[in-house]
């Protein structure tokens, strides 16, 4: 069964239709030196059965959280996913829908996004949430660009320990703008120093950015950081893990002007790194500067509720050259997963997920701290993730634990740092936690 | 279409009204412009103190499905922006009155005479 029906005769007739005598004549405008000028080195043709078999054997080489006990975190977490999520999001109406420009035929998709926006507003304690962005890192970078656009200031201060990949994305975004400088706060005992932050603040600071919990899993003093930001007229940007908000205070409650986050923990699988979900919320006063799009609820001419794309005039398809953001597509399917996840769990369910993640992480940290040679690096309070100092290099710990079908955590050496970053979710049973601690004990 | 005889107009559909002191003027968009844009939902203006060259953008007016730039009819400085435009629909309702947008101090008041008069503007919009 051929997938590309493109025979010599087909090609001949296409060339004839376009009025040229050969393929070379068709591409005569492309200079010879930039053409490939050699044959493509493709594997021999294979039929569907063979291709399927090759791909399945490649996929089987992956080691996933389906077979391994995972303590991996660092921005992506192994939370339990209720089966209903997959059943709902795989409905073809949702799975295949592109941007719902035509409201008349897109009410289901529009309502799903509206529900997502409403749920995230409640979770983050904010007034307005957009229809989502690519991922947490780009949402954070867009938040900083938005702050610079709002107050016209140039300097950005990062308070505490931001995920290095988020820092890197932020730097990439700011490189294109002329003057913006990012100042990283000094970190002491796992969290940003408020005293050092005070010294960095002045009236040229556009925004203060904080990640809560931070990259080390520690809890920053977000109230003090927010106060300092506002005392100097800077916007306060918080990047918060959404599941942590089941036990921690919402960013809106401690004064965040813009709240962002990586939405993967809300119902999306880790998927080897994506696609993920960028959460982006603001206070009402900032809605006109919000990147991306919003879905609003209104009444139609018969007085019935209806859903529409609103505030889309700052997007590419209407004002490309003046769009406040280059992100036009959203992550609608991941946003839907988040909405379904939050709807299924409810407020009580989410706080149980967060509470169990927290208490199991603290149980494991206690067990690891008791193993000779191992210690918990920081004293700061943490949610479900913490840094472990190990008696042998973390990379060795990770490698040896793979033999026991355990993902031991993130080797911070990969980030130019030290230690092993260990994350625990509600999925880890006491038996698994004990097994992991016992196995670590054998390495000491 | 309402085109008051006492005002001057631009090809970009702004109007300007020279005030009695002969040095300042009010600027807004025409009745034709507001009717073409449809429901206006937001007006964003540069703050008082902003110096403008002729034809420089001094803000944007946003309707449900489009956004239009606002161009200074002549050079000058923004003295005041209309705080009443928090209710942007005012521009639809009263484009030459309470829907005015900025008050300008003009660099050269005589330059207003170079703009379109009501008859010329009426011809431009075909009615």
From Swiss-Prot, chain A:
Xref: InterPro entries: GcvPA, GDC-P_N, GDC_P, PyrdxlP-dep_Trfase, PyrdxlP-dep_Trfase_major, PyrdxlP-dep_Trfase_small
Highest taxon of source: Bacteria
Reactions that this protein is recorded to catalyse: N(6)-[(R)-lipoyl]-L-lysyl-[glycine-cleavage complex H protein] + glycine + H(+) = N(6)-[(R)-S(8)-aminomethyldihydrolipoyl]-L-lysyl-[glycine-cleavage complex H protein] + CO2
GO molecular function, one term: glycine dehydrogenase (decarboxylating) activity
UniProt-listed GO biological process terms: glycine decarboxylation via glycine cleavage system; nucleoside metabolic process
Pfam families the UniProt entry points to: GDC-P
Keywords: Oxidoreductase
E.C. no: 1.4.4.2
Subunit (UniProt): The glycine cleavage system is composed of four proteins: P, T, L and H. In this organism, the P 'protein' is a heterodimer of two subunits.
Main function: The glycine cleavage system catalyzes the degradation of glycine. The P protein binds the alpha-amino group of glycine through its pyridoxal phosphate cofactor; CO(2) is released and the remaining methylamine moiety is then transferred to the lipoamide cofactor of the H protein.
Family stated for the protein in its record: Belongs to the GcvP family. N-terminal subunit subfamily.
HAMAP family per record: GcvPA (MF_00712)
Protein name in UniProt: Probable glycine dehydrogenase (decarboxylating) subunit 1
Biological classification of the source: Bacteria, Pseudomonadati, Chlorobiota, Chlorobiia, Chlorobiales
Gene of this entry: gcvPA
Curated annotation (Swiss-Prot), chain B:
InterPro entries: 2-oxoA_DH_lipoyl-BS, Biotin_lipoyl, GCV_H, GCV_H/Fam206, GCV_H_sub, Single_hybrid_motif
Entry note: cofactor: Binds 1 lipoyl cofactor covalently.
GO BP annotation list: glycine decarboxylation via glycine cleavage system
Disulfide bridge positions per record: none
Cofactor(s), by name: (R)-lipoate
Modified residue annotations for N6-lipoyllysine: 65
Domain Lipoyl-binding: residue ranges: 24-105
Keyword Transmembrane: no
Endpoints of the signal sequence: none
GO-annotated cellular components: cytoplasm; glycine cleavage complex
Pfam families: GCV_H
UniProt KW keywords: Lipoyl
PANTHER family: GLYCINE CLEAVAGE SYSTEM H PROTEIN, GLYCINE CLEAVAGE SYSTEM H PROTEIN-RELATED
Function in brief: The glycine cleavage system catalyzes the degradation of glycine. The H protein shuttles the methylamine group of glycine from the P protein to the T protein.
Oligomer status and interactors: The glycine cleavage system is composed of four proteins: P, T, L and H.
HAMAP family, A to Z: GcvH (MF_00272)
The family this protein is said to belong to: Belongs to the GcvH family.
Protein name: Glycine cleavage system H protein
Source organism per UniProt: Chlorobium luteolum (strain DSM 273 / BCRC 81028 / 2530)
Encoding gene (name): gcvH
